[in-house]
Structure formats: C-alpha cells, structure tokens
C-alpha cells in the first residue's frame, strides 16, 4: 500500500454512485455526523430520562398514598374495635406491643400520605403540560429523597408493621377465649379458714344437699367451657399461635422477594449504564482513530 492511498481512501465517498457533492460523504464526515447525532440523541435521552423520572415519581406517590390510606385506616379500626376482656389478665408486654405497633404504623403511613398529598399535585400539574421543556418545572428532582422516603415507608416499613399488627391483633383477640381464670386453689379444710365466717353463716342456712351442690359447682369456674381442665392453654391460644406460625414464613418470603427485586432492579440499571458507556467509548475510539 502506498502512502497516499490511506488518505485517498478516507476522502473517497462512501457512495461512489452518487455524483452530487451533497449526496456523498467521506468516512471522517460520516463519523463526525454520527457523533453529532449521538450527542443530539444523548440530549434527547436526558430529556426523556427526566420525563421518565417524573412519571416514576408520580406513580410511586400514587401507590404510596393508596397503600398508606388503606393500611393506616385498618390499624385505626383494629385499635378502636378490638374488645378487651375485663376478667382476663393480659400479659403486660402484649398490650404494650399492640399499642406501640399500632401507633408507629399509623404515624409511618400518615407521613407517607402527607408527602404524597403535598408533592403529587405539583407533579400532576407539570405532567399534564404537553411541552418537553416543562419537566424542569417539577419539584420531583429536588425532592427526590422525600419521594423515596415515602415510598420506602409505605411499602417496606409499613408492610412489615402491618404484618406485625395482624399477629398482635390475633393474640389480643383470641387469647382470652377458653383461657383459665387462674390456677385452682389447694384443698384446705374449712376449720382452718377463719376469714370466711360470712360464707359459713350463709352455708349454715342451706341443707346439706344444696351445700354439696354449690361446692361441686365451684371448681367449674376455674375451667371455662370448651377447654379441657388438664390442658395448659385454651383454643384461643392455639388460634393465635397458628396465625403467628403462618405469618412468620410470610414475612420471610416478603423479605426475600423485596431483596431479590431491588437487587435485580439495580443490576438492570447497572447493565444499561454499562452499555451506554461502552457505546461512548467505542465512538471515542473511532474519532481518535480518524
């Protein structure tokens, strides 16, 4: 190959059959034109990316507002409508956990609902304008952290609290059913119990047969209906334990799905950015070679 053949090849038109100068282009002009087209496409893609972020923020705020309104309303109804048995001694930790979980659940979802209510009208107003340059008028870029915080509170933290709320409601509601009133007292001779003079005086007026009937009916109070006296727990405790045993695997599956989903989403975004960087590197190498 001679020395001038390379330059002549670069200056030769890509389409030699076209005789008009406007219809022919050298390789250098072709690469330059491709670079300009890519820069224009990048500007267009940046604008399209801004619109995509706007629509994504709007969708997240809408989803978080609907979810937060539903779950917070359920938590409030659960706290108001739950009926506590006065004659049952609840564990103090159970009532404290139920009250704290309900309060935190309502507070988290109300915060997400407040962010959605404040930001969503401004984003909706900009998205309804049919102008490509109007995307910069939306506050979703500047308040991106609040959008993500509301989305995380509503979908991640709020859902975990809701699962815990369901478990606690089951314990508060079902534990008193069939629960023993207390341990049966040991049998003590009546002669060794001086404080019960009133009951003895009342019992003296009864016939021996009626007194035997009343004494035979007293132990049944310590064992409510639908419960075996020998069992330590009633059917309510078994129902609450069943709901807990079901909800624990559901929570683990939820955590696994959330981690897998966000990991796949991050991997997809990383691959897309990697492909764009490789395209820019290839074009830069072609320009430097020319």
UniProtKB/Swiss-Prot annotation:
Reaction it catalyzes: Ca(2+)(in) = Ca(2+)(out)
UniProt activity-regulation remark: CRAC channels are regulated by fast Ca(2+)-dependent inactivation (FCDI), a mechanism that limits Ca(2+) influx and cell toxicity. ORAI3 subunit displays prominent FCDI. Inhibited by lanthanides such as Gd(3+) ions.
Entries under InterPro entries matching the protein: CRAC_channel, Orai_sf
GO molecular function: store-operated calcium channel activity
Residues with site note (Confers selective permeability to Ca(2+) ions): 81
Phosphoserine PTM sites in chain numbering: 42, 45
Ranges where the record places region Disordered: 1-21
Entry-linked Pfam families: Orai-1
Keyword flag Ribosomal protein: no
Keywords recorded for this protein, A-Z: Calcium, Calcium channel, Calcium transport, Cell membrane, Ion channel, Ion transport, Membrane, Phosphoprotein, Transmembrane, Transmembrane helix, Transport
Membrane topology of the entry: Multi-pass membrane protein
UniProt GO BP: store-operated calcium entry
Listed PANTHER family: CALCIUM RELEASE-ACTIVATED CALCIUM CHANNEL PROTEIN 1, PROTEIN ORAI-3
Assigned protein family: Belongs to the Orai family.
Subunit structure: Oligomerizes in homomeric and heteromeric ORAI complexes. Native CRAC channels most likely consist of hexameric ORAI heteromers, implying that diverse ORAI1, ORAI2 and ORAI3 subunit combinations with distinct biophysical properties can operate in a cell-type specific way. ARC channels are heteropentamers consisting of three ORAI1 and two ORAI3 subunits. Interacts with STIM1; this regulates channel activity. Interacts with CRACR2A/EFCAB4B.
Purpose of the protein: Pore-forming subunit of two major inward rectifying Ca(2+) channels at the plasma membrane: Ca(2+) release-activated Ca(2+) (CRAC) channels and arachidonate-regulated Ca(2+)-selective (ARC) channels. Assembles with ORAI1 and ORAI2 to form hexameric CRAC channels that mediate Ca(2+) influx upon depletion of endoplasmic reticulum Ca(2+) store and channel activation by Ca(2+) sensor STIM1, a process known as store-operated Ca(2+) entry (SOCE). Various pore subunit combinations may account for distinct CRAC channel spatiotemporal and cell-type specific dynamics.
Protein name as catalogued: Protein orai-3
Species: Mus musculus
Gene that this polypeptide is encoded by: Orai3
